[in-house]
Amino acid sequence: MVLVIEIIRKHLPRVLKVPATRILLLVLAVIIYGTAGFHFIEGESWTVSLYWTFVTIATVGYGDYSPSTPLGMYFTVTLIVLGIGTFAVAVERLLEFLINREQMKLMGLIDVAKSRHVVICGWSESTLECLRELRGSEVFVLAEDENVRKKVLRSGANFVHGDPTRVSDLEKANVRGARAVIVDLESDSETIHCILGIRKIDESVRIIAEAERYENIEQLRMAGADQVISPFVISGRLMSRSIDDGYEAMFVQDVLAEESTRRMVEVPIPEGSKLEGVSVLDADIHDVTGVIIIGVGRGDELIIDPPRDYSFRAGDIILGIGKPEEIERLKNYISA
């Protein structure tokens, strides 16, 4: 008993600070007031008194009860006033809570409770392209800048206010429950700090990082990034290879373009697939589905243009190019 009293004494002040708790206690007090009043003034049972209290507070007025004493009439009037007043206060507080919560969400001040979402740490023009590609997915951008917040909300994504290099803010974005984390910060040193913070929280979440300088790619990998992309290296090489004809750059841009009729796609081979143990030649994927096979990923290895005698295994990732309907046929063909 002493332990229970001590627990109540310790936690009660904190619980009472919650607006919802105070409203609940106010409603409960009115119900107790009405039930006790009808019981002692009108002489009704506790069950009937509780029922009359709810009917009176709700102003339903079924017509199955009216006070039989003058004191009961006065009491009913006070209960109606208290009931309507309490209901009005409860609705006002509820609306205030919902509005404040929505405002806090827009400001990025609410912790992310989602799972299997994508977290983007930082902001750049690359981020904007990411958001276009991830349209329809649950995406949260973690950044501090007010201008970034406006851009994120305009793009239809969610904003989380915080410093991507701070572990507490990474936890706020719930990187532990994320499907993947994209790190797109201004400098490689910030990117490394961010990756280390993410790995401190979750050792298995997939991290894709952007490298500002080519010589830092290996350091980002050592910090814990699963995939490191250097847009400057890619664009530089494509520009240099476009000097003579430019078809290589044209191919990459067309395949990756948002409005392209053909898309590059990764399709995993599941357990029990009809392609398990089947060679590239016998699978005849292009003739069956229309998808052009560029390569096959197995573990950390990417086999570009796999030989005809290459046998597929469960867990292999087929990298191909095709139209949306061809890609759908490939998925159905693999899972059949």
Swiss-Prot record:
Keyword Calcium among record annotations: yes
Top-rank lineage group of the source organism: Archaea
UniProt keyword Nucleotide-binding present: no
Annotated ranges, domain RCK C-terminal: 252-336
Pfam families found in the cross-reference section: Ion_trans_2 (PF07885), TrkA_C (PF02080), TrkA_N (PF02254)
Annotated ranges, domain RCK N-terminal: 115-230
Transmembrane segments: 21-41, 70-95
InterPro entries in alphabetical order: K_chnl_dom (IPR013099), NAD(P)-bd_dom_sf (IPR036291), RCK_C (IPR006037), RCK_C_sf (IPR036721), RCK_N (IPR003148), Trk_Ktr_HKT_K-transport (IPR050721)
Motif (Selectivity filter): 59-64
Keywords: Calcium, Cell membrane, Ion channel, Ion transport, Membrane, Metal-binding, Potassium, Potassium transport, Transmembrane, Transmembrane helix, Transport
Chain positions recorded as Ca(2+) binding sites: D184, E210, E212
Phenotypic consequence of D184N: At high calcium concentration, mean open time is short and mean closed time is long compared with wild-type
GO molecular function, one term: identical protein binding
Locations listed in the record: Cell membrane
PANTHER family (alphabetical): POTASSIUM CHANNEL PROTEIN 2-RELATED-RELATED (PTHR43833), POTASSIUM CHANNEL PROTEIN YUGO-RELATED (PTHR43833:SF9)
Any further remark recorded for this protein: It is not known whether calcium is the physiological ligand.
Free-text comment on this protein's domains from its UniProt entry: The channel is composed of 4 repeated units, each containing a transmembrane pore part and a gating ring part. The gating ring is composed of eight identical RCK (Regulators of K conductance) domains, in an alternating arrangement of one domain from each of the four subunits and four from the intracellular solution. Two protein interfaces between dimers of RCK domains from the pore-forming subunit and from the intracellular solution hold the ring together. One is called the fixed interface and the other the flexible interface. The flexible interface forms a cleft where calcium binds.
Protein name per Swiss-Prot or TrEMBL: Calcium-gated potassium channel MthK
Organism encoding this protein: Methanothermobacter thermautotrophicus (strain ATCC 29096 / DSM 1053 / JCM 10044 / NBRC 100330 / Delta H)
Organism phylogeny: Archaea, Methanobacteriati, Methanobacteriota, Methanomada group, Methanobacteria
Gene: mthK
